[in-house]
Curated annotation (Swiss-Prot):
Cross-link Glycyl lysine isopeptide (Lys-Gly) (interchain with G-Cter in SUMO2), where in sequence: K91, K94, K106
Protein name (Swiss-Prot/TrEMBL): Small ribosomal subunit protein uS13
Subcellular location: Cytoplasm
Keyword Cytoplasm: yes
Pfam family, one: Ribosomal_S13
Organism (species): Homo sapiens
Source lineage: Eukaryota, Metazoa, Chordata, Craniata, Vertebrata
GO cellular component terms given for this protein: cytoplasm; cytosol; cytosolic ribosome; cytosolic small ribosomal subunit; extracellular exosome; focal adhesion; membrane; nucleoplasm
Length: 152
């Protein structure tokens, strides 16, 4: 970062209920938002026509609004379906990019649905066990250790 800080520099930006560090480069700063990774951030910034080397605090209000609208409506800006993190939603079959609090809500809804239909994955989540086929004989134990009593 240069030694001279611009007049309208924002050290912390509030975007989609997330605090973003204004001193970081914009491409990496917006990855602080849940549901936005480095690749998605680069694609969004290219579509918004924003310089990737710019600091997040140097953005104007107009540029921030552009980034937010592209992140929330990626299909309108011709970001391909395979790039999105919510494909063929179970309820409505739509493709979307779920961000911030919406991501937590969708994950919770998915787990509740799996538990409700008594799917194997849902039951494993309910019991607090490993879900993806890992062995559980020796690892993943919780609770107090049971000692061995000595013979007399």
């Amino acid at each position: 970062m240069s030694l001279v800080i611009p007049e309208k520099f924002q050290h912390i930006l509030r975007v989609l209920n997330t605090n973003i560090d204004g001193r970081r480069k914009i491409a990496f700063a917006i990855t602080a938002i849940k549901g936005v990774g480095r690749r998605y951030a680069h694609v969004v910034l290219r579509k918004a026509d924003i310089d990737l080397t710019k600091r997040a605090g140097e953005l104007t209000e107009d540029e921030v609004e552009r980034v937010i609208t592209i992140m929330q409506n990626p299909r309108q800006y011709k970001i391909p379906d395979w790039f999105l993190n919510r494909q063929k939603d179970v309820k409505d079959g739509k493709y979307s990019q779920v961000l911030a609090n919406g991501l937590d809500n969708k994950l919770r809804e998915d787990l509740e649905r799996l538990k409700k239909i008594r799917a194997h994955r849902g039951l494993r989540h309910f019991w607090g066990l490993r879900v993806r086929g890992q062995h559980t004989k020796t690892t993943g134990r919780r609770g107090r250790t049971v000692g061995v009593s000595k013979k007399k």
